[in-house]
């Protein structure tokens, strides 16, 4: 009984401290073509069920922008994921568009997936596989307006 209580306490402490689970795989996402150091780079990693609809804690991060590239690190269970990112240059916490829906900030999707007719790519087009040994993916920011 005492061993079960101690094992449960250790598991709870591991989760509380944010220590990655033993089965997690390292994922490195490099966002390149960052044109200025203004604002933040906002990145979310999705599974198929929440593609572009739900920002899940632990898979949604913001880092200060820096000219060139910004690198994000995650520890996630092996599986199929897709990522979306944007350069929140004005720091308002949202992806800005003009009245016609034209993007005013740089953005990118994993797997080099592109916007078609002002529609984001499908999960299948943007998805990649995270194997148990880990992976590195690069997302190339695209700016439709001057930076």
List each model region and its residues.
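Acidic, glycine-anchored loop motifs typical of Ca2+
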Residues: 89-97
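Exposed aromatic-hydrophobic patches
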Residues: 69-76
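Bacterial N-terminal signal peptides
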Residues: 8-18
């Amino acid at each position: 009984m005492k061993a079960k209580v101690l094992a449960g306490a250790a598991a709870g402490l591991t989760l509380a401290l944010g220590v990655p689970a033993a089965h997690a795989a390292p994922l490195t996402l490099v966002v390149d073509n960052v044109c200025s150091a203004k604002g933040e780079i906002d990145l979310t990693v999705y599974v198929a069920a929440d593609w572009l609809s739900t920002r899940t804690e632990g898979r949604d991060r913001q880092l200060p922008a820096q000219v060139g590239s910004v690198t994000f690190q995650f520890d996630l269970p092996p599986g199929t994921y897709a990522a979306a990112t944007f350069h929140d240059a004005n720091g308002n916490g949202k992806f800005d568009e003009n009245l016609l829906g034209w993007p005013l900030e740089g953005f990118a999707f994993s797997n080099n997936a592109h916007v078609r007719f002002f529609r984001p790519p499908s999960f299948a087009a943007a998805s990649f596989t995270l194997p148990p040994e880990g992976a590195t993916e690069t997302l190339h920011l695209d700016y439709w307006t001057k930076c």
